[in-house]
Structures are given as structure tokens and as C-alpha cells.
């Protein structure tokens, strides 16, 4: 009797699974399934002449910061997400006393099917010097290309950070991603930390003076700059501090772009 009841429950469960699967297939074909994807594309612009500090924040997706022509900062959010979530993402830009904040707002915080979301935020900045450029993302990579700033602050929980800049103070932090910073020359302090990723600092011009503080628990440390010895080049100079628990650390001269 008990065995028959268990068999009936098992059959009912299998039947419900089959019905659910068929229902999802039908909904997908009708374009109403949670698995159906849609294209997201939205953009906003803001005047550059009112900006000295720029803060960019998004919880999901990659961030590219690139130089552009013109007099406005241009923010473009594009990618794919489930059709049910298309209205959940929007750009929000605010300005206050010289600081411009660009943020991707996610109205619905909890979804079962967020693994299908693939977004990219591209910020175009005119060729004007910023005091500070700050980029923060929870799950995506960060790339900064030739944008002028006195200070760069990059934070990503799980993504990689890559920078191609002329010079400036650098503060870069990520938990699991790699950090690569390529500069024309090292004239200001650099601080970079990654729990598990490699950290590479590249300079086209060898520094005449430099101080380093390098800490890698299980990774290798490699510095191939000319005249580098025991953590120093010459006397004084900017400080390059690199920290990684399991990643490799490297400072090198390269041929440039």
C-alpha cells in the first residue's frame, strides 16, 4: 500500500515536471518566457564644463571609459537581458558642486534568471583633465582608455581592471580579478590590491626615482625596471604598493601603445 502510494506520488511529480517543461517551451515560443532575451539600449549626456570629479557606479556589467570629441560626457548602456527585465535598468545622472555621478539603476533587485543579463556601460569623456575619476562595479570588468585625470580610483568585487593612461595617482581594488595599469610614466603613487588576481604595472618611460612595497603571499614578484635594486630606483620618487594573496606581481618597462 505504502509502495503504491509512493509510486503514484512519483508519477504525479514527473507529470508536473513534464507539464511545466512543455509550458515553458510554449511561453518561450510566444516570447513570454522568463528565458526570452531582449536588447537594451539607452543613453544620456551631460555638460563637461560643470564636472571636475566623475563617479561611475553599476552593480552589474562591464564599464568602459573612453575619450571622445565634443563638450559633453556621454553615457551609453547597452546589452541583453530578459524581456521581463528590460524596464528595470535605467541611467541616472546627477551633478552637484563639480561632481557628476553616473549610475545604472536596477529597480528590481531580485531575479531568478539574472544569469542571462549581459550589460555594458560605455562612458565617453571629452579630452579635459578631471581631478578624480572613480569607477565602481560589483560584478563586471573595468577598462579606462586615455582619459585624463589627476587621480584614478577603480573598484570591482569580481571583475578585472585594465587601464591605459598617461599618468596619475592610481588606487585599484578587486577581490578576484587581475589588475593591469599601463602608463607613459610613473610620476605619482600607485596602490593596487587583489585577493587572487595578478597585478601588472607597465611604464613606457623608465622612472629615475621610485619606491616599491610589494607583498605576495604565494605569488611571484618580478621587477625588470632599469637600475632597480632592493625596492628602490634612485632617491625618493613615487611609491608603488602592490598587494595580492595568491596572484603574481610585476613592474616592467614596455614599448607603449
Regions found by a protein language model. Give the residues of each.
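Hydrophobic membrane-insertion alpha-helices, especially the h-region
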Residues: 9-27
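Short, surface-exposed interaction patches in beta-rich subdomains
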Residues: 164-165, 169-257
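N-terminal Lys/Arg-rich, disordered targeting/topogenic segments
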Residues: 1-6
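Short Gly/aromatic-enriched secondary-structure transition segments
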Residues: 70-80
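A cross-taxa feature marking solvent-exposed loop/turn segments within ectodomains of secreted
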Residues: 84-86, 207-208
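Aromatic-capped interface at the extracytoplasmic side
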Residues: 25-40, 44
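Beta-strand elements of well-folded, non-transmembrane domains
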Residues: 60-62, 79-81, 108, 139, ...
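Right-handed parallel beta-helix
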Residues: 40-53, 62-64, 70, 86-168, ...
Amino acid at each position: 500500500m505504502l509502495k503504491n502510494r509512493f509510486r503514484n506520488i512519483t508519477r504525479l511529480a514527473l507529470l508536473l515536471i513534464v507539464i511545466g517543461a512543455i509550458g515553458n517551451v510554449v511561453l518561450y515560443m510566444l516570447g513570454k518566457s522568463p528565458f526570452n532575451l531582449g536588447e537594451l539600449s539607452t543613453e544620456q549626456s551631460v555638460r563637461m564644463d560643470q564636472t571636475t570629479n566623475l563617479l561611475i557606479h553599476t552593480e552589474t556589467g562591464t564599464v568602459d571609459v573612453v575619450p571622445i570629441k565634443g563638450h559633453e560626457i556621454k553615457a551609453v548602456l547597452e546589452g541583453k537581458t530578459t524581456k521581463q527585465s528590460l524596464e528595470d535598468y535605467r541611467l541616472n545622472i546627477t551633478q552637484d558642486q563639480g561632481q557628476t555621478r553616473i549610475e545604472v539603476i536596477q529597480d528590481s533587485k531580485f531575479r531568478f534568471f539574472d544569469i542571462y543579463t549581459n550589460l555594458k556601460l560605455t562612458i565617453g569623456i571629452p579630452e579635459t583633465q578631471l581631478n578624480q575619476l572613480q569607477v565602481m562595479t560589483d560584478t563586471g570588468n573595468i577598462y579606462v582608455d586615455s582619459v585624463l585625470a589627476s587621480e584614478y580610483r577603480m573598484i570591482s568585487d569580481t571583475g578585472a581592471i585594465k587601464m591605459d593612461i598617461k599618468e596619475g595617482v592610481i588606487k585599484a581594488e578587486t577581490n578576484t580579478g587581475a589588475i593591469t595599469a599601463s602608463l607613459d610614466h610613473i610620476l605619482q603613487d600607485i596602490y593596487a590590491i587583489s585577493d587572487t588576481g595578478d597585478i601588472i604595472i607597465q611604464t613606457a618611460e623608465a622612472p629615475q626615482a621610485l619606491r616599491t612595497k610589494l607583498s605576495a603571499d604565494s605569488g611571484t614578484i618580478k621587477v625588470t625596471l632599469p637600475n632597480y635594486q632592493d625596492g628602490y630606483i634612485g632617491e625618493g620618487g613615487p611609491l608603488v604598493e602592490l598587494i595580492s594573496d595568491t596572484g603574481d606581481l610585476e613592474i616592467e618597462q614596455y614599448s607603449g601603445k
